Amino acid sequence: KPVELKVENGKVMAKYSEIMDTKERSIVFKVKVKDSVAIGKDITNKAIIHVDDPNHPVIDPTAKITPQYKDGKIATHKKVNNHKPKLGEEIEYRISFNNTVKDGKLAEVKIEDEIPSGLEYVKDSLKAEGDKPAPVELKEEAGKVSAKYENITDMKERSIIFKVKVKDSVEVDKAIVNKAIVDDTKNPPERPEVEITPQHKDGKVKADKKVNKKDPKLGEEVEYRISFKNTVENGKLEKVIIEDTIPNGLEYVKGSEKAEGDKPAPLKLSVKDGKVIAEYENITDMKERSIVFKVKVKEEAEVGKEIINKAIVDDMKHPKEPEAKITPLHKDGKIKA
């Protein structure tokens, strides 16, 4: 054994005495590579072995090491620019990652995203964002988006971005989960995901108004019918408000108002101060619905002068103003002789 073995001021020293065999002996010690050293630059460690005998030359064995980056580790997340897209709308996905280890290196990062059923990739929408190195591979094939990066030695965020279109055939209000796989080949793969919930398209209302008699006599009753429907397939009318102010010369027939058509029925149907009001919500079909009411032509209405009855049918985006015209006539006379 050495008669002396110590470390002082960064120098390892050992001393042996009277070795008379041919067996190998070693001293062993450990060092830690500092974070501050230059990556890829050789460090040579030279020892000096000398024997206290002028016939033995000094021996200076060396060993080299080349410091490398630490193994990196990824952090990932996935975002979508619209969590509640309408049928037929385009949305944008963003898959982002970064190395979380200072002085670490991600030798390879692979990203894969299988586009779920109900979504359709938008051609040429795939792109990468972030500092160099750019991805060595970035493509979409058969509904799968893939990217590959190599030799990332910083901690900056990089992203791949692509767009999809929500198919008209998907089920409204049923969540679609899009999950990516981001693999740094050293640690268990990350699986960031994001959820969207498809919504109906915006509906658009079409309206018309009819009267059952265009030339009523003074004192007669006539029936008005205001009809409307959604004209957009897979569209939704969230709210429809109908208002009809009964013109001068006409008088509402009490209790005559009613609604016709499939559910949903109107939440509100009333007549107040000569105004007929109806309100519908959440219409998702394209069927026709109507409100119907009667008026009586007043005796003092001017014969032969047109009375225009205009309604407002408002879907909060594209209001319509259907109208119907009547021309009051004299009552039938009766002769007395």
Please place each PLM-identified region on the residue numbering:
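Exported/extracytosolic protein signature
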Residues: 1-337
